A protein has these predicted regions:
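N-terminal secretory signal peptides that target proteins for export/translocation
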Residues: 1-12
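Structural microenvironment flanking redox-active thiols in thiol-disulfide oxidoreductases
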Residues: 93-147
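Short active-site neighborhood of thiol/selenol oxidoreductases, capturing the structured segment around
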Residues: 74-95
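A short beta-strand-turn-helix
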Residues: 50-55, 61-80
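Bacterial N-terminal signal peptides
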Residues: 12-33
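N-proximal helix/coil linker or "cap" segments that precede and/or mark the start of modular domains
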Residues: 27-28, 32-60
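Thiol-/selenol-based redox modules, centered on thioredoxin-like
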Residues: 164-204
Length: 204
């Protein structure tokens, strides 16, 4: 409980959005320990949003990054791609995850891997998030949720009036554009190193 209290004290929220922002922060930090949606809602989300499996072609996408530049999966053909989905810009868990990737970025580059973050936040939100945390990789805006849904990472928590947000899922995509590894509902802390270790195994 002390840990969660510290988490929420670190979040800046408006009075009108206090409850929703607090819940997003909890979900963003907690990873697999996040509060689960009711079974019926989870089933409905799963039915509408099915993740591609290892060996399948990664769904194509074209999204704007924090600078407004359009990025597509095809741009990275011939490279490994780490495509990670996260719930919301600026929340504690999402910031931790992004900053750990930032600190490991040279290791990803040595592994011939591009890192792309995705959430449903708008481009202006991405810009602030990237600038505040000096992120040296693209964070992409999926406001239509099309890409998040294509990768099976779309979820909702109707009991908290939170709809169509990204779950913390990560996909490693090989240089031929196929899914090599999928992580679902991961812990933010330590995930960057886990992905680097998996990349090393896949590249042997």
């Amino acid at each position: 409980m002390d840990h969660l209290a510290k988490t929420f004290s670190a979040c800046t929220v408006t009075a009108s959005g206090l409850l929703a922002s607090a819940v997003v922060a909890l979900l963003a930090l907690a990873g697999p320990a996040a509060v689960a949606a009711p079974a019926a809602s989870a089933s409905a989300t799963a039915a509408a949003s099915v993740a591609p499996e290892a060996g399948q072609a990664a769904p194509a996408f074209r999204l704007q990054d924090q600078t407004g530049e359009w990025r597509s999966l095809a741009d990275y053909r011939g490279k490994w791609v780490v495509l990670y989905f996260y719930p919301k810009d600026g929340t504690p868990g999402c910031t931790t995850q992004a900053c750990e990737i930032r600190d490991d970025i040279f290791a990803f580059r040595r592994a011939n891997a591009a890192v792309l973050g995705v959430s449903v936040d708008a481009v202006n939100s991405k810009k602030g998030f990237a600038e505040e945390n000096n992120l040296p990789f693209p964070v992409l805006s999926d406001t239509t949720t099309t890409t998040t849904k294509a990768y099976g990472a779309l979820t909702s928590y109707p009991q908290y009036k939170l709809f169509n947000i990204s779950r913390r899922d990560t996909f490693i995509i090989d240089p031929q554009g196929r899914i090599a590894r999928r992580y679902e509902n991961v812990n933010a802390e330590g995930h960057s190193k886990m992905v680097l270790a998996e990349l090393a195994k896949l590249q042997k």
